[in-house]
Swiss-Prot record:
Role summary: Catalyzes the reversible transfer of the terminal phosphate group between ATP and AMP. Plays an important role in cellular energy homeostasis and in adenine nucleotide metabolism.
Disulfide bond annotation, renumbered to this chain: none
Record-level GO BP terms: AMP salvage
Record lineage: Bacteria, Pseudomonadati, Pseudomonadota, Alphaproteobacteria, Hyphomicrobiales
Protein name per the record: Adenylate kinase
Molecular function via GO: adenylate kinase activity; ATP binding
Reactions performed catalytically: AMP + ATP = 2 ADP
Length: 196
């Protein structure tokens, strides 16, 4: 099972990916984790990424695409994987399609979790209030203003992927505002249909 989750921050992609990882035994691959692993392993591409990051730059699509391409060949990805935070742009999506085609792999599903952004902001505000009331530390990215900025960035940079995957006939859109269990069940129905 090879799967991509799309949706804005706070839509529940991480929660759903964890559930699928636990159930199917396939890895959730995040761009950040893959970059850190490549740098830590000292691979050639990891060294290139480290040089860019050490200089304070953004790692290029070419480097990210190569790291993802190498990672999806790892033995733990033999049964599939869930991509989290990749692709972020249409050029990355096209590079992924090319890489997978060369490996005779296909995506089983691209699932977009649609959410109401104002409801998401209220959800974050409530989470912050609950964390403060419990005496906990608020995550820096849970600041409502920072969260709004992440939503704007998502709309501008990542949202065009929905149109791209829709044109490819690969996009399935689900209600990310539904109960967590209901979303999981809907995702599993999509995956059953894809593997039939």
């Amino acid at each position: 099972m090879r799967l991509i989750f799309l949706g804005p921050p706070g839509a529940g992609k991480g929660t759903q990916a964890k559930r699928l990882t636990d159930k199917y035994g396939i890895p959730q691959l995040s761009t950040g984790d893959m970059l850190r692993a490549a740098v830590s392993a000292g691979t050639e591409i990891g060294k290139r990424a480290k040089a860019v990051m050490d200089a304070g730059g953004l790692v290029s699509d070419d480097i990210v695409n190569q790291i993802v391409s190498e990672r999806i060949e790892a033995p733990d990805c033999a049964k599939g994987f869930i991509l989290d935070g990749y692709p972020r742009t249409v050029p990355q999506a096209k590079a992924l399609a090319d890489n997978m085609r060369k490996k005779n792999q296909v995506l089983d599903a691209v699932i977009e979790l649609k959410v109401d952004e104002e409801a998401l902001i209220r959800r974050i505000e409530n989470r912050v209030a609950e964390t403060i009331a419990a005496g906990g530390t608020v995550r820096s990215d849970d600041n409502p203003e920072a969260f709004r900025k992440r939503l704007t960035e998502y709309r501008e940079k990542t949202a065009p992927l929905s149109a791209y995957y829709s044109e490819q006939g690969e996009l399935v859109t689900l209600d990310g505002m539904a109960d967590v269990d209901a979303v999981t069940e809907a995702i599993e129905r999509v995956l059953e249909k894809a593997s039939a």
